[in-house]
Amino acid sequence: MIDHIGFPVSDYERAKAFYAKALAPLGYSLVIEVMQQQTGHNPAAGFGANGKPDFWIGGEGGLNKPLHVAIVAMDRASVEAFYKAAMAAGGRDNGAPGIRAHYHPDYYAAFVLDPDGHNIEAVFHGPRA
């Protein structure tokens, strides 16, 4: 089981604003922000649900290659809301909401590229309600 994931971004404030909007439909919000004065490192923002930060961004510089992160959605409507919110926040389409039957018959997901080109996915693994 993964406890949390973190990765550097090229523009901390831009990425923080993007994820605050894009992850809200999935029940995520900014849980904690750690500033440089506290650690001696670049600032970091921890997003999560139910008060537990499990999705971290930080630093300045970004990565040489994009990451793929999939976040579980509560239902298909949440996948669609994530996609709309992420696009409105400046994300780029990398796969509109829909069934991805090549994974399994009920794999309903949407993919958005964040401002640094990371492939962020919201996925629901259940049948249509």
Residue ranges and their predicted role:
Residues 1-3:
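Extreme N-terminal starter segment of soluble prokaryotic enzymes
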Residues 7-52:
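Core segments of cupin and vicinal oxygen chelate
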Residues 11-14, 70-115:
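Vicinal oxygen chelate
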Residues 29-31, 55-57, 93-97:
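A short linear hydrophobic-aromatic micro-motif
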Residues 38-81:
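Long, continuous compositionally biased terminal/linker segments
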Residues 101-102, 125-129:
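A short acidic/small-residue loop/turn micro-motif
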Residues 119:
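Glycine-rich acetyl-CoA-binding "A-motif" of GNAT/NAT acetyltransferases
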